[in-house]
Amino acid sequence: MSKKIYFSTTEIVPFANVSSMAPFSTAVPTILQDLGHDIRTILPKYGFISERKYILREVIRLREIPFSFCGEEEIASAKSAFIPKTRVQVYFLESDEWFQPLNNLLYKSKNGRVLMDNSMRYAYYSKAVLST
């Protein structure tokens, strides 16, 4: 029996590949799709992810979705692409404030220190994912 699955992650090869989570988050959706399930993945749209290289496209129904975070009204939007060499769809959650300034280390600054706002960044991401 086919299931509809929404898979949320912070890394997927080749878009964001920092830890062992990236290959895992690439393999699991691919395997589930090969088993006949309808799977969609969602990932933060980090500033270093090239829209041109990965052919990210606007998703009209995922534009400007309002949600509340820490008592503030926020707006979430997402773009879409596919994991290369698969038909697994990936939604990229956009936020200029939370994801745009990150370098390709994701969780750390260039000097190796863990970013102090990681907990808030991924709390925002989790809330936005549940709202889309």
Residue ranges and their predicted role:
Residues 45-132:
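A conserved catalytic-core segment of Leloir-type glycosyltransferases
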Residues 37-39, 90:
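Hydrophobic anchor at the start of a short beta-strand
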Residues 21-25, 29, 126:
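Short, highly selective alpha-helical patches that border small-molecule cofactor pockets
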Residues 1-18, 43-45:
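Nucleotide-activated donor-dependent transferases that construct or modify glycoconjugates
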